[in-house]
């Protein structure tokens, strides 16, 4: 009697534990905690506050630098990265992942030429874009609208631009090449965009 009363609960607990792990491990993988995350493995949309947002670089899903601490890729770049870098060639379309109001369209230090769009308590930053802006401050933008093009590595005619490449040519902020730096700020605080995919 003592044998059954002890081992039946133990076997039951082991069964629950094994079942839980077999369910939990794939879930970790699905959300990027076990394997690398590439948005095209799932969908090209993100979900924040139950509203759908769309991927800002259509056709380009390779992330070259993730949110958080990293080795700075170039002089002037911080070790804390407040967004993600999406590899895309110069001239590629950048679309608004959300509707909102343009609150900034200018050179923004290490971010280079940047467009900011606000929607409630969220601010979306699209950085290292072309200096030929397609939008202006105060303009209402619809989700999916082309708002900018991926900018070149080198930009000229930016007064007091401290960012330079190894040849001394001025760069589009702290950058080593053409890409989109995409960031989301919630209530003014940087959040990891990949947490919302």
Region spans (language model):
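Short, exposed beta-strand-loop hairpins at the edges of beta-sheets
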Residues: 181-186
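N-terminal Sec-pathway targeting helices
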Residues: 1-13
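Bacterial N-terminal signal peptides
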Residues: 12-20
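Surface-exposed, glycine-biased beta-strand/turn segments
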Residues: 25-113, 120, 143, 153, ...
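Post-signal peptide N-terminal regions of Sec-secreted extracellular proteins
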Residues: 139-140, 187-190, 197
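Zn2+-dependent peptidoglycan hydrolase active-site motif and core
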Residues: 79-82, 96-137, 154-173, 178-179
């Amino acid at each position: 009697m003592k044998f059954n009363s002890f081992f039946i609960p133990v076997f039951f607990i082991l069964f629950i534990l094994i079942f839980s792990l077999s369910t939990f491990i794939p879930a970790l993988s699905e959300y990027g905690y076990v394997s690398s995350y590439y948005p095209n493995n799932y969908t090209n949309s993100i979900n924040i506050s139950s509203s759908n947002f769309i991927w800002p670089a259509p056709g380009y899903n390779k992330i070259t630098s993730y949110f958080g601490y990293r080795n700075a890729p170039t002089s002037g770049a911080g070790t804390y990265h407040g967004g993600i870098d999406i590899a895309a060639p110069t001239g590629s379309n950048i679309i608004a992942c959300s509707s909102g109001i343009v609150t900034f369209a200018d050179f923004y230090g290490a971010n280079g030429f940047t467009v900011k769009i606000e929607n409630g308590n969220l601010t979306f930053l699209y950085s290292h874009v072309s200096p030929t802006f397609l939008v202006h401050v105060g303009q209402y933008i619809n989700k999916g609208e082309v708002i900018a093009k991926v900018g070149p590595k080198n930009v000229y005619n930016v007064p007091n631009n401290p960012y330079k490449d190894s040849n001394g040519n001025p760069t589009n902020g702290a950058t080593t090449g053409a890409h989109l730096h995409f960031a989301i700020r919630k209530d003014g605080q940087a959040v990891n965009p990949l947490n919302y995919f």
